[in-house]
Amino acid sequence: MVPLEAGRQTIRFNVTHEGWNINYFTISVPVEIPSYEEVSMVNRWKNQYLTDDGSGVLKYAGNIDSDNIDAYSWDFIPDEDGYYTIQNQATGNYIVNDGSGFAACMAESGEGDSGKWILRNVSGYTKVTSLLDDTLSLALENQDSQNRVELAEAPDSWYSAHFTLNSTRFDYDIYPDKIVDGPYTMTADNGKELHSTYENNTWKLTKDISELPQFTAENMPISEALYNMALQESLEDIFTETSIHTGEKVEVFNTGANWNKVWTRDTAMSVQYSLAWAFPEQSGNSLLQKIQGDPQEWVEDTGTGGSYPASTDRIILAMAAWETYLATGDTEFLEKVYDVTKYTLEKDFHVNYDPNTGLFKGETSGLDHRSKTYPDWMDEGYFSDIMESKSCNTNIEYAVAFKVMEQASEILGKDPAETEKWAKHFEALKQAINDTFWMEEHGYYSSWQYPEYMGNVLAEKTDVIAAGYAVYFDIATPEMAEKLMENYPLVKYGADTVYPQKTGKNFSAIYHNRGVWPGWEAALMEAAMVGGNHELAGEIMKSIMYGAARNLSNEEVINYETGAGNDAHRQLWSVAGQLAGYYRVLFGMTYDLDGIHFAPYVPDWMVGPFELSNYSYRDATLNLKVSGQGDQVASLKVNGEEKGANYVLPADASGNYTVEIAMEDSGEHSAVNLKPENLVICPELPEMQLEDGVLSWTPDTRYTYKLWTGTEYIDVTGQDSYTIPQNVYGSYSLVAVDEDGIASELSEPIVWNPDGTVLKYEAEDASYNSDCFANSIQGYSGTGYVQDNRPNGGTDITFKVNVPVEGDYLVSALYNNGGDTTSGNYAAIRSVLLDGEDYGTMSFSITFDNAFYRSPRMRMHLTEGEHTITFTYNYNGNIYDQNMNISRNNLAMDQLILEDISTMSVVESPVQLGLDGPETVETNS
């Protein structure tokens, strides 16, 4: 008898007898039948959970009740033949086939085989079949009003009979060679293979990564395997395309397995995290591919409402360009991106800057899937409300661009007045962000602000990109940063992408809502390192490692409850976030103008020593070694010489450097907000009706209610109606609040205009080229509309308006811009002239085809009497109205609307950038 252990064994035969021949041999190793404890059973079809409510019948529910998790938690205990009993953690009851056609929950496991179950793997899911009658399986195919789980003759093709088993423990265990999470174990015996029981598959290192920075962890092979996986997936994400500048073939990054193109924000975030360090050439090439036009500007990708200026986060490319410069020191590259960023900012000041709040308008950066982030009513055929809203994280990206321009202008020897201008813009926008978006009662930033016509009220939710960038880029004050890092909501599998989660028509989609994005939580991870909350950095690093290990790829989205990936493999920002955990956390590197700073953090679940060799930085090659655990540098040696914790590797270093860092625990530990309650989902979106000046609604006794009037919240708990003040402009939205203080989204606004305060003018009665009159699109008012197709053809449209009372007015239009509302890039843009003078820009998202919709509102102060309001294209020789499509910029205008809001006290930010208007700049285009 020879005992055999788990894993690969080597058996040698020494044949000494002439004529002996071994044809075959058999080895039998007993297979250990796994038990699963504290696991939930999640159905594949509708993402429903099995639970025992004590009724005697197995039930299903849409979500786990966080106050009664044990009712959704099960123990699977095998017998010696591999058949399972399934016992509920809360009641102690067993799932039994009692012959009723439905699965029963009983105190005993039943007689004979009635309480025994066969578990089979079907397409990576678990099918639970009765041993008593193996033609019957647990299924949710025929759902009834009592939510009972049936026993059905379910073919393997039924998703309703497929279950995922997930641990209901709110943690998982990381060991040197494996990660264990309930029924799933991810194992690596070396850095070249990693096996996951989730889909019973193995990742293998198949590419040559020897030219890249090499990570070794002799005592923690799973960390080595995950690093190598990230390098391999980085190489798999590189492809070749023609440079738009030189016509030569260049290597660039695509966005992932499903996205074979350079994508603006994906590339920018990935480059900033780590790719600029590990792949500086491909990073620079990728950024330069996101330039277009004359003058040259950064590209906004296709998306919500026709891309720019519904989405305005293209300015994020400036931060990535800066990180690339820090990695390379290439001033020619810096000069190029300086000019591009300068013109982009000039244009954006005209197109989407709001001087009344000191903020830039546009969709949340990254969170660009409309009703997956915003209330459903903002996603109903047009996107004016998203266009007119202001996003915290996008404004932070603008502030970062100002800081980049300040530093770059000094390096490039620009006029000191220009450098000072950028510095002032940074400080002003930083203050506007903090004054506007910071929610002191929550200890973090609001994700976005509703439109001005609603009173600029804040959304009572936050997002991980805003949190991370606010700390990392020095937007938050030190006090804010400390609170934010301690309060930002974490769940078992990482940082909530948004919090709280929303209900609505896209609730079933695991995306921004109910998802963890490794490529976004990495922003909070790097922020936690510079902000000093090492526990937060470690938690996020651990979650990024878990997601890749379980799913055997750096997936884009991880289900925030189950840990399962969304099959978007080797997503670039997830790959880059994984590498950032090694470079920025474990080895503690940050790049600055003076060189590389080192401040490692080794969590107590990481077992060293760790080494990073063949690491290139400009003209130097580094070999980094980190030993010990903790957050404090005990010793730092360079080429054998003690240098101390404040050592900076110079930017002009050349040759070989060995940096050895010994770590110890400082004894200081920060708090993090990691708890099951952070899985919370906000109340359903309320609905209101207006009749005869009275708002009404049907209250839900589970909630309290507050009514937003456009200027303030009013407590309306216990009421089902509210009489509107007749002589005051208002924008009314209802908010439901649960017992834990979690607020719903604002209901669809009902705008009240006092009598005589709305002026309407038909477009066909304005001054325009008569050849542009049209009436083919249905739903217009009057006799038709004006079709203004640019850049080839079209017409200026000039309205004569008669203003009865001086005051502030909201100017808008009814319009159509039919097309692809989710992936087009031809939002219409027009300059607006008041009495022949440039007043700003009005933008028009893509809409559904055969209807007219309300445009964003522009706030305009008008004196009493006659005025002209003109919509024109590229006024006075500028090309601010050129959209991302360039060749299609079409607008059908039906009606001009002026709303007198003098009776409304509009909420304003006290801080403004103080611009007299955009400057004309010369660029090297």
Regions found by a protein language model. Name each.
Residues 33-170:
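Lectin-like carbohydrate-binding module/patch detector with strong preference for beta-trefoil
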Residues 526-692:
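Non-catalytic C-terminal accessory modules of carbohydrate-active enzymes
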Residues 687-690, 919-925:
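Short, solvent-exposed loop/linker segments at the N-terminal edge
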Residues 692-700:
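Conserved aromatic anchor
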Residues 167-260, 331-333, 344-347, 409-411, ...:
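Acidic/polar, glycine-enriched structural segments that form the non-catalytic walls/loops
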Residues 182, 217-260, 284-308, 353-390, ...:
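Extended glycan-interaction surfaces of carbohydrate-active proteins
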Residues 1-33, 727-729, 735, 747-907:
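Extracytoplasmic
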Residues 186, 260-267, 271-366, 391-399, ...:
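Aromatic-rich carbohydrate-recognition surfaces in CAZymes
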